């Protein structure tokens, strides 16, 4: 019998005014992928945040992943909005936030932010590389993944200056540099053109075959 990788039981999420999720239960077998459809404000993002431990909930969420060497890399959540620290570490920013020239100079570039993530995950044994390459330098790995989603020309651009579509691609690259056991995507196709959607689908199919659930 195939093992279950995720078990959600009687999940309830409340705000001060509303019950956002009320008694949600489901399970996901290992090697299964899941797409959740629904209108805006129907609770899809709330469910993702509950699974990744970003919000308080009642009920239970159990995850069971095998062959994982780094616990924090088990689950990766690509959100609609990505916040980040400036280089001096004093402020939080997000894409398309109002900024002045000082903010741009103090914001990390795409490459700097990806290199930081890569280094944090460097203890893992496997890194995703387009074309199935076995090894590569940190820079080559990052550049290859940037290129496949069409933003390699922006690698030295400050994050705060990216458009919505560019920022979505950056977030996807960030998750794909070192694929987790579970990848949760919130509206992944927003801001992508048709060619980029096809490329992303190919990447997701590739990492799914290699053990990442989506």
Language-model regions, residue ranges each:
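ABC ATPase nucleotide-binding domain "signature motif"
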Residues: 162-169
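Conserved ABC ATPase signature
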Residues: 128-131, 158-162
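ABC ATPase nucleotide-binding domain signature region
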Residues: 48-127
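Hydrophobic anchor residue at the start of the ABC signature
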Residues: 172
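A short, flexible loop at the N-terminus of ABC-type nucleotide-binding domains that lies
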Residues: 2-32, 41, 56-58
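Catalytic Walker B motif of ABC-type/P-loop ATPase nucleotide-binding domains
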Residues: 183-187
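Conserved ABC ATPase "signature" region
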Residues: 112-119, 137-154
């Amino acid at each position: 019998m195939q093992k279950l990788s995720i078990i959600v039981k009687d999940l309830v999420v409340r705000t001060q005014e509303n019950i956002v999720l009320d008694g949600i239960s489901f399970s996901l077998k290992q090697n299964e992928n899941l797409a959740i459809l629904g209108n805006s404000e129907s609770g899809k993002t709330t469910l993702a945040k509950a699974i990744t431990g970003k919000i308080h909930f009642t009920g239970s969420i159990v995850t069971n992943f095998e062959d994982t060497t780094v616990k924090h890399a088990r689950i990766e959540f690509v959100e609609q909005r990505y916040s980040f620290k400036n280089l001096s570490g004093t402020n939080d920013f997000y894409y398309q936030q109002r900024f002045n020239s000082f903010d741009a100079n103090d914001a990390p570039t795409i490459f700097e932010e990806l290199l930081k993530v890569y280094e944090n995950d460097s203890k893992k044994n496997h890194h995703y590389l387009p074309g199935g390459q076995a090894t590569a330098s940190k820079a080559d790995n990052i550049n290859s993944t940037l290129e496949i989603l069409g933003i390699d020309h922006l690698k030295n651009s400050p994050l705060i200056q990216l458009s919505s579509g560019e920022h979505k691609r950056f977030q996807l690259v960030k998750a794909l540099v070192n694929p987790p056991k579970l990848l949760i995507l919130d509206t992944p196709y927003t801001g992508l053109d048709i060619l980029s959607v096809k490329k992303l689908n190919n990447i997701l199919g590739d990492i799914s075959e290699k053990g990442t659930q989506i």
